[in-house]
Amino acid sequence: MEYNEFEIISKFFKNHQKKDKNQIKGIGDDSALIKIPKNNLLAISTDTLVEGKHFLKNITPKDLAYKSVAVNLSDLAAMGAKPTWITLSITMPKSDSVWLKSFSKSFFKILNKYKLNLIGGDTNSGPLSITLSIYGLIEGKNALLRGNAKNGDLIYITGNLGESAAGLSLLQKKTFLKNVKICNYLIKKHLKPIPRISEGIALRNIANAAIDISDGLISDLGHILKNSKCGADINLNTIPISKILTDNFKIDEYLNWALNSGEDYELCFTISKKNIKKLNVAIKKKIIKCTCIGYITSAEKGLNLIQNQKKIIFKKSGFNHFI
Amino acid sequence: MEYNEFEIISKFFKNHQKKDKNQIKGIGDDSALIKIPKNNLLAISTDTLVEGKHFLKNITPKDLAYKSVAVNLSDLAAMGAKPTWITLSITMPKSDSVWLKSFSKSFFKILNKYKLNLIGGDTNSGPLSITLSIYGLIEGKNALLRGNAKNGDLIYITGNLGESAAGLSLLQKKTFLKNVKICNYLIKKHLKPIPRISEGIALRNIANAAIDISDGLISDLGHILKNSKCGADINLNTIPISKILTDNFKIDEYLNWALNSGEDYELCFTISKKNIKKLNVAIKKKIIKCTCIGYITSAEKGLNLIQNQKKIIFKKSGFNHFI
């Protein structure tokens, strides 16, 4: 069955959630109306996912809904913001009720998991693409910014890098693995990245700068360095790479995935040495799992990759949507 | 020349405007960070414009930039909100510098006119489409909502209806007119609608309910009636239609444009009789130009169109993106 845009909203996207007390108007008026609690900043991030660029043509509506929200949540995580509201603009070739049912079920599942309320949006017909704007609150003034890294800071990464790219490579049949269990694990890492929300909130009072790894470590760390006017020395031997990758792939392959492929949605952050104790407490309490991969230097030193105590030459290339 | 996404942002969309004092972070971090002034509500609206649906394939980048912002501003106008910030997600087949230069010039022109600051966004490659999220402030608590119309309220329309649809019909070569000057005037009405921002702000303390005419009077007034649980009697003889339309087109044609075609972006609002004096003051001060077209009744009476004192039968059909 096909629906028009008003039917799509009322059938699949309206009244699925309780209003929160700061949401004066949600879906169904010319705009949403919200109230920002005192002493809070509002973090706003927006991301478009286009078929064939950010997701494969054969992605299921369930996986698409999860990933589009997770990717946007990751931007809030990198600011240390608490997720609150979201708007969804969806453009799709036809209003297929089976597709919409599956999409909206998965969409509200992740929204409810992260206590996000849908407050508005738009539905259109056209080639499949999704734009989400996501809103988070930051109590006080300590947001995690890209531009606050300081010379001498230590650089850390949450989790592991490269598994998402391995999963994508398997999905695209560029890589093959006999072990179905491992295949499925890596594909899941690509399709269901976990936004590091609680880590980001915990890091607000520990880290100086942060970014999420969406375009690849080299490219994303590059943003921190550019905005902070710093350089960095990275020890390649310490890059967190899972045993699954080191056991099943060649070093060139997984290092390239870890450095140049994106979509891990781990956080890369810098902390001053005086905050190491605080970080260790958070690690001990299992709020955060992270690895030190190097340190911030001065801008004129640039970004250096060191492997087995030797500087190595690398090709700096993150994910670029226009190549 | 072609650019990658970071070059597009830094060359065409960054540092074109002064930061306002409530904008802690704009473009260039994982999210924007804003501070909402005390006693203000934040209005948020989002709209996607897709090639071939909301704009014709041969639209110029200049017209596209203007219209996408104007359409979003119109949603804020219908809430009585003061425009403040905007985010832009643009998907385009290639990063053509001539196109981008023209688009961004026109984009910042309308932004500056309405004191809107660009605080973030996203660029992608794919079939041309634009998603804007727009943010406005409402001092106090009096937003113009769709659901506040009361039985006995008078119904008004700002400006005239139908000219945008006439312009579209000319652009699509469904209609022909010999007079080039009139043709260009009507096409301009379609391409450059004026969002009724100052009218919306003035109406916050006068009107009960409001909506902007994006999908057609019948459809949009229908939203007020549905949300307010009311009916309405509309006198077709009073629908504001310009002399240009009545002189150059048949009555069936222009009435259909006025009732069923959208994109006039005028405001339809209801006021209680006790506020007529206040409205007349605003009309006298030239803050608002509007026409009374009928009144609100009870829900069981439904929506009735009256022409020459007779009820007429009409086909209720606004613009539906999925038909």
Swiss-Prot record, chains A, B:
UniProt-listed SUPFAM superfamilies: PurM C-terminal domain-like, PurM N-terminal domain-like
Residues that bind ATP: 121-122, 146, 214
Sequence intervals crossing the membrane: none
GO biological process, one term: thiamine diphosphate biosynthetic process
CDD domains per record: ThiL (cd02194)
One Pfam family matching this protein: AIRS
Keywords: ATP-binding, Kinase, Magnesium, Metal-binding, Nucleotide-binding, Thiamine biosynthesis, Transferase
Reactions performed catalytically: thiamine phosphate + ATP = thiamine diphosphate + ADP
Pathway linked to the protein: Cofactor biosynthesis; thiamine diphosphate biosynthesis; thiamine diphosphate from thiamine phosphate: step 1/1
Binding site for Mg(2+) 2: 47, 75
Residues that coordinate or bind substrate: 54, 263, 319
Residue numbers binding Mg(2+) 4: 30, 45, 75
Key word Ribosomal protein present: no
InterPro entries in the cross-refs: PurM-like_C_dom, PurM-like_C_sf, PurM-like_N, PurM-like_N_sf, ThiL-like
Molecular function GO terms recorded: ATP binding; magnesium ion binding; thiamine-phosphate kinase activity
Family according to the record: Belongs to the thiamine-monophosphate kinase family.
Miscellaneous comment as given in the Swiss-Prot or TrEMBL entry: Reaction mechanism of ThiL seems to utilize a direct, inline transfer of the gamma-phosphate of ATP to TMP rather than a phosphorylated enzyme intermediate.
PANTHER family referenced in this protein's UniProt entry, alphabetically: THIAMINE-MONOPHOSPHATE KINASE
The protein's name: Thiamine-monophosphate kinase
